[in-house]
Structures are given as structure tokens and as C-alpha cells.
Amino acid sequence: MKKRQNIVFFFSDQQRADTLGCHGQPLPVTPRLDAFAREDGTDFALACTPQPVCGPARAMLQTGRYPTQTGCYRNAFSLPLNEKTLARCLRQAGYEVGYVGKWHLASDETENHYETAPVPLERRGGYEGYWMAADVLEFTSHGYGGYIYDRDGNKYEFDGYRTDCITDCGVRFIEEYQGERPFFLMISHIEPHHQNDRGDYEGPEGSRERFGNFTPPKDLEPGKGDWERFYPDYLGCCNALDANFGRVLDALKKKGIYDQTMVIYASDHGCHFRTRMDEVAEGGYDDYKRNSFEGTIRVPLLIKGDGFARGKREEKLVSLLDVPATILSAAGLDPKSLGFLGRPLQEAGSPDWEEAVYIQISESFVGRALRTHRYKYVVWDPGKNPWTESGSSVYREKYLFDLEKDPLEKNNLLEGTVDGELRRRLREKLLKKAAEAGEQFAVEDYYRQ
């Protein structure tokens, strides 16, 4: 029987896809990732998140289900204790599992407050082995210095740059690996997410000098948002992630297991830098994400391993929801029989691959979106409180964009004469994808408020 692959999932937070050189970044921000895409992995050039908020995206990745199906539709909801998770499925299949970095699935608004405390074993989603993590990493650390906790709840303090120190823990797992069983290791960083308590992006020292001469993405308009102030440090964070991703690859090679290891690089969502703040409904909140625009939903996704061509740029539209299914498939498991949605990305080259991503919006407004290869169709219920209500029975059309002709999403086709057949097809597809997520609702036609 063929030996099963080890799996390393290197995960960033709030990273735009266009921070990578292979996605158009002109500065030398991601040389290791670019080389990885060029030589070893498949670059999924049209990868989208199904939920652009930190906690819900993480719940989705651990369970292979939409956030509304687990109840984790916004931040500050803990992952239910009985959920079938990646870690539990892989452990049952004989894998050694490890987790490092930001968890963000243990604390809630009841009696469970682990933002700065050790995460109890039962709230780790099945990661019962190697554990070096904090529930809310931005509460226990800053760009330089902080602490996480080990498996036994002992505090592990660090003084250096956070991305380096978190990666140290992942590299240690690889160095100490005995090879008795295949392993799954998730290294979950907070960079390049902003530092909440300081209202800043904390790149390594010298980031503003190194990346001050940046070319802004076309969707970031001059005079809007705060990208002009923060983008150099944001790129500095991404550069640190790149260097540390390279350290992980080097550790796998030094251990002699690189060729036997699937490696995944992805982020939970992108960042619009407060440039699209017209999205917030009453009771809602936004700063850098929480909407359906391309800068928010497009994420980097690169994979090396069995079933993935080296140096391929895959132009098929894919969802982060496909990643858990991909991991289980790599471990020899059947995702569908385990209740995981999505489709293994090993099959993305298939002619019957469905290019449609379903997106749930929370915290800023209660909305749903369908992203196809060419179009984006967005609906919302502005009367719902996006902090207390997860969905609606009746949505109203909000946006329809032709991304081929209007990549910056400035021309809402719903405000003019709309092709009725196109509108019908997109609505039908949206409702079909919603049903797959366990949702049923009606959609009313757009009207100007």
C-alpha cells in the first residue's frame, strides 16, 4: 500500500492574494512562495474565501462545513465540542496531529473566556497532541513579544518577531518528528492582520523603508481608507511570512521528508483597508474585511503534493471550503462520507469542476454572495442585525458585477437594464449553493433605497 502523505498547512491571516509576486506584486515580498509556485506547487489563482471573517473562516476549515452550519457565523462563537473536525478524522485514521499559533475557536460570550488563558483540551477541536497556541493571539502578543501555551497549559514566552517565533514551534515539531505515523501540522499565523489594541500593522523593523516604494492595488483608491499609511508594514508582514514559509520547507528537506509531504499555503480572507465602508448595516461593524469585494474574498492558495502539478497556474475558481476535503483526500479518506462539503482540489482539473463559490457575510451586514468565473451576485437583508442574526428568510438583491468588464466592481448592473436570463441563472445558482449549505430563502429584486 502506498505510504500516506504528511501534510503541513501554513496559514496566514487577512492576506490579499495580490501580495504575492506570482499574483502581480512587483516588489520582492514573496520570493520563497513565488519559487514554490514556479517549481513545486500548483497556484490556485482564483481562490476565494466563503466567509471573510477570522473565526468563521477557521471554523469552516476545521469542519469542512459552512459557518452557519456550526453556529460559528461570526467571531466570539466557540466551536461546538462535538463537531467532527479535521484533527479528529485524521487522528482516527492514524495520523499524528499538531497545531501552532492562532486558534480563535475556544472563546465565546458566555462563561468561556480563553482569550489570554490556556485553551482547555476539550476546546482544541481534537488537537490532542502537539499544541503551541493561543486562542486569540492578538491578545497575548504583539509584533514583537508575547506568549502562547503548550499542550499542558504552560506559558511559552517569546521576545522576537511573532511570525519567527510561531514558526519556531512548527519547525520544532518537524525536527522532533519520529516518522512512526504520518502527520498533519497546521501553523496558523496572525500576520498580516492588524494589531487590534494598537490600531496598527506591525511589520518587522525596517518594513517602511524596504517596502515604502510600493505600487498600490488598483482597488485601493487614493484618499480612501488607511492603506497609504499601513501598506508598507502590511507587505513587511507578508515578507516575514514568506521567509518563515521557506524555513518550514527547509526543515522538511533537512528531515528528508519534503517529497513525502503535502504543503498548503493559504489565508482566511483578504483586506480592503477601510476603502469599502459603505457596506455596514445598522448594528453592524467593519474595518478591513466583512464584505464581498474582490480585495476581501480573494486569497492566496498554493499546494504541493500528490495529485498537484508542479509549476501549474490553475485558473479554475475554487473555494477555501475545498481545502479540508483536499486534506482528507490526501490522507486516503472520503470527505463526503465524513460530512465534509467542498471537493478535493486534486480534482480541480476535471472538466466537470463547478466554478461557483458561495459566500456568507456577517458582522457588517447579513448577506450572501455567489462568485462565478465572470460574475458576482450579492444579496442582503439590511433589516437584520448582523451581530445577532446569522441569516434571513428573504434577501434583496444588492450587487451584480461583470468582473470581466468591471474588475474593480464600480458598475452595479442592477442599477441599469439587466439581462433577465443572466439574472435568473445567477439567482438559481445562488439558491442551489445555499441549499448545499443547509439554507433556504427567497430573493427579492433590487430597488434603490
Where are the language model's segments positioned?
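Polar, surface-exposed loop/tail segments
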Residues: 30-31, 61, 93, 102, ...
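C-terminal, low-complexity/hydrophilic appendages and adjacent surface loops
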Residues: 144, 151, 293-294, 361-415, ...
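A long, amphipathic alpha-helix that forms part
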Residues: 167-175, 217-261, 433-434
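Active-site-proximal N-terminal segment of extracellular/periplasmic enzymes that hydrolyze or transfer
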Residues: 1-42, 91, 408-419
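Catalytic-site neighborhoods of secreted/periplasmic enzymes
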Residues: 60-160, 195-209, 367
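Long, internal low-complexity/basic segments
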Residues: 1-5, 16-17, 43, 200, ...
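Active-site regions of oxyanion-processing enzymes, predominantly non-cytosolic
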Residues: 2-9, 112-132, 163-216, 253-262, ...
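Histidine-centered active-site microenvironments of extracellular/periplasmic hydrolases
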Residues: 28, 114, 251-312, 319
